[in-house]
Amino acid sequence: MRFLLGVLMLMISGSALATIDVLQFKDEAQEQQFRQLTEELRCPKCQNNSIADSNSMIATDLRQKVYELMQEGKSKKEIVDYMVARYGNFVTYDPPLTPLTVLLWVLPVVAIGIGGWVIYARSRRRVRVVPEAFPEQSVPEGKRAGYVVYLPGIVVALIVAGVSYYQTGNYQQVKIWQQATAQAPALLDRALDPKADPLNEEEMSRLALGMRTQLQKNPGDIEGWIMLGRVGMALGNASIATDAYATAYRLDPKNSDAALGYAEALTRSSDPNDNRLGGELLRQLVRTDHSNIRVLSMYAFNAFEQQRFGEAVAAWEMMLKLLPANDTRRAVIERSIAQAMQHLSPQESK
C-alpha cells in the first residue's frame, strides 16, 4: 500500500497547475458575437443593466446559456428567440413592433390629447356660465370643477400604467419567483427527508430559485451554497452547480464538501478547461486525504476522462486496498482498471 501511495503522490506532484479562461471561443468573431449578444439582452432582475454588465446570478446563467447555444451552432436570431420565449420581449432592448406595443405608444398621446381637450372645454364652459348665473360663487365653483377636470386623465393614465406593467413588467415571472421563495423552506425540508416523496424536476427548479433568492440575502451561508450546488447537480444545470460550489469553496477552501462538490462539478462539465481545473483540485484533495474513497473515486474518473490512465489505475488500486473484501464496488473498480490498462504502454503497465 505504501508503494501505491508513493506512485500516486509522484503522479500528482508531477502535474503542473493550470490556469484557465472561463470561456473559450472558436475564433475572435464568435467572441465578438458573444459580447454583442450579452450587451443586447436585458437582465430580468437588474432591469437597467444588460446581462453583460450585471453580476446577478440570473445574468450569469443567461451568459452561460448564450455561450452554450453558440457552441451548439445557434444563430444570433435563434438565441434571441430562445431568450424571448423564456423571459418575454422585455429581455431585449429592441422589442418587435406588435399591436400591443403600438397601443402602449399611442395610449399616452391619446390620454394627453383627451385630457387637454377636457381642460379646454371645461374652461370655456366656466367662462360662459359663471359670470351670467353665479357671479358671487365663481371661485368655489371653479375650485370644484378643477378637481373633476383631471379625473379622466388620471383614469386613462392608471389604465396605461396597469397594462404596461402587466405586459412588460414580467408580472408572471415575478409571481413565480415570489411563490418559489415562499415554498423553498418546505421543499428543502422535503428534499432532506428520506421518508418523503422525492421532488420532481419542477419542484427542484422552484427550490433552486428560492434558495438563490435566500442566498442573495445571506451570501455567507456556506451550507446553503453547498445545498444549492447539489440541487444544480440533480437538475443537470452545470451553471448553477458550478457557481454555487465555487462560491462555497471561496468562502471556505478547507470545507471538504465544498471542495469535492466543486471538483465534481468541474469534472462533469463539458468544458475541457473545467475538467483540467477539476483535476488540479482533486490532486490537492488527494494530497490532503489519500484515504477518502469519494475523493479517490472522483480523482480516478477525472484522470481516466483526461486519458491520464496511469493515475486512474493508481487511484483505483488504492481504493481496492481500502474497501472491504465483500464490497460490491470492487467488481466495478476491477473492470475499470482492466479497461484503463488496455490504454497503457508496456512500460507504464509494469
UniProtKB/Swiss-Prot annotation:
Give the transmembrane region(s).
97-119, 147-169
Q: What is its main location?
A: membrane
Pfam families according to UniProt: CcmH, TPR_CcmH_CycH
What Gene Ontology molecular function terms does this protein carry? metal ion binding; protein-disulfide reductase activity
**What are the recorded Gene Ontology BP terms?**
cytochrome complex assembly
Q: Which domain of life is it from?
A: Bacteria
Where is the protein found, in the record's own terms?
Cell inner membrane
Topology Cytoplasmic: residue spans = 120-146
What are the binding positions for heme in this chain? C43, C46
Span of the secretion signal? 1-18
Query: Which residue ranges contain the repeat TPR?
Result: 222-255, 293-326
**InterPro entries linked to this entry:** C-type_cytochrome_biogenesis, CcmH/CycL/Ccl2/NrfF_N, CcmH/CycL/NrfF/Ccl2_sf, TPR-like_helical_dom_sf, TPR_CcmH_CycH, TPR_rpt
Membrane association type: Multi-pass membrane protein
Q: Which PROSITE patterns match?
A: TPR, TPR_REGION
Entry keyword set: Cell inner membrane, Cell membrane, Cytochrome c-type biogenesis, Heme, Iron, Membrane, Metal-binding, Repeat, Signal, TPR repeat, Transmembrane, Transmembrane helix
Q: Name one GO cellular component term.
A: plasma membrane
Periplasmic topological intervals: 19-96, 170-350
Q: To which protein family does this belong?
A: Belongs to the CcmH/CycL/Ccl2/NrfF family.
Q: Per its database record, what is this protein's job? A: May be required for the biogenesis of c-type cytochromes. Possible subunit of a heme lyase.
Q: What is this protein called?
A: Cytochrome c-type biogenesis protein CcmH
What organism is listed for this UniProt entry?
Escherichia coli (strain K12)
User: What would be the name of the gene that encodes this protein?
Assistant: ccmH
